[in-house]
Amino acid sequence: MLKREMNIADYDAELWQAMEQEKVRQEEHIELIASENYTSPRVMQAQGSQLTNKYAEGYPGKRYYGGCEYVDIVEQLAIDRAKELFGADYANVQPHSGSQANFAVYTALLQPGDTVLGMNLAQGGHLTHGSPVNFSGKLYNIIPYGIDASGKIDYDDMAKQAQEHKPKMIIGGFSAYSGVVDWARMREIADSIGAYLFVDMAHVAGLIAAGVYPNPVPHAHVVTTTTHKTLAGPRGGLILAKGGDEDLYKKLNSAVFPSAQGGPLMHVIAAKAVALKEAMEPEFKVYQQQVAKNAKAMVEVFLNRGYKVVSGGTENHLFLLDLVDKNLTGKEADAALGRANITVNKNSVPNDPKSPFVTSGIRIGSPAVTRRGFKEAEVKELAGWMCDVLDNINDEATIERVKTKVLDICARFPVYA
């Protein structure tokens, strides 16, 4: 018989120790990876619920298993909230991840070998937008578009590539682009050749939900997102659409189940429902506004300290530092900042001379530190500390001094109070 007082600590000390160490790491390190965030205890409560026990293949009202009357309510809540939050009339909340959601879109709209126009990974795109090491690059004919000399998306080149190659689908969205995307312009380009416009808004979904960044749903045929990152929910995916094309919606549903997945993760879907409700609260909008303010404040410090920021600024939650002229690699910068308890990720920059395993840049994002309560004053101080480390990358005394400051500010701004 299962007893509710059963716990990991008493049963599996080795695993529990690693879990506890990760908890300490999150509290004592400043998280600046743009794709990471802290989810609420309510979301974690849903993920740790008995819903994990329930198999529910199919969709609400159309299940293959019995006993789904309550998980139907859970999933319908998540669907309805997703549609309301993003102004969609279709939502699928079952994808296990953003990549799974993207895979479903490819499956629904394309045939293997079809031509797709996607953002170059080296210039800000994502693996699932056509990287040769990903299913998207292996199964489809990918034509990359990129950025111009100013670091902005080159829409003229995109239009030219579209006319020349006649892709069946154009992908909007990014994993390392700090500007505002002109979704309407992308739709114009797609319409000019009769292509689908598919937008992956994973990185900016929270900003979009709060009205801080333009919403692609009115412009795209299909939109996907993760439910973590700026949306601050559980790790998972979501598909949205608007326009009333019921045939498209059926294709998308079939592409998720039974094509790509079996039973949905009902405990995660419940957590998505919680996070979507949280994203409708007034304080969520205040949070997202602060995310954008904090990113801008950090950029200002880096520029004043002589660091190159790709595109010269940011209009969302992230930015890239180009370290080529500092004779530093992203790998070196990542490691040095890590020793000071500041977590970033190495990232390729435009025309990067280094390999993706080394890189010449780092990506910095503000969602997690803002979630802790940091405002402009704190992130400016933080950016200054980062410059101190990068200016003295081999000076362990500087790194230790910064680490002490990091530990102090983390204690004053805990993740979970």
Curated annotation (Swiss-Prot):
Record Gene3D superfamilies: Aspartate Aminotransferase, domain 1 (3.90.1150.10), Type I PLP-dependent aspartate aminotransferase-like (Major domain) (3.40.640.10)
Pathway(s) it belongs to: One-carbon metabolism; tetrahydrofolate interconversion; Amino-acid biosynthesis; glycine biosynthesis; glycine from L-serine: step 1/1
Compartment list: Cytoplasm
E.C. designation(s): 2.1.2.1
Swiss-Prot/TrEMBL cofactor(s): pyridoxal 5'-phosphate
Pfam families reported for this sequence: SHMT
Known catalytic reactions: (6R)-5,10-methylene-5,6,7,8-tetrahydrofolate + glycine + H2O = (6S)-5,6,7,8-tetrahydrofolate + L-serine
Residues that, per the record, bind (6S)-5,6,7,8-tetrahydrofolate: L121, G125, H126, L127, S355, P356, F357
Keywords assigned by UniProt, alphabetized: Amino-acid biosynthesis, Cytoplasm, One-carbon metabolism, Pyridoxal phosphate, Transferase
HAMAP family in UniProt: SHMT
NCBIfam families documented for this protein: PRK00011.1
Protein name as catalogued: Serine hydroxymethyltransferase
Lineage: Bacteria, Pseudomonadati, Pseudomonadota, Gammaproteobacteria, Enterobacterales
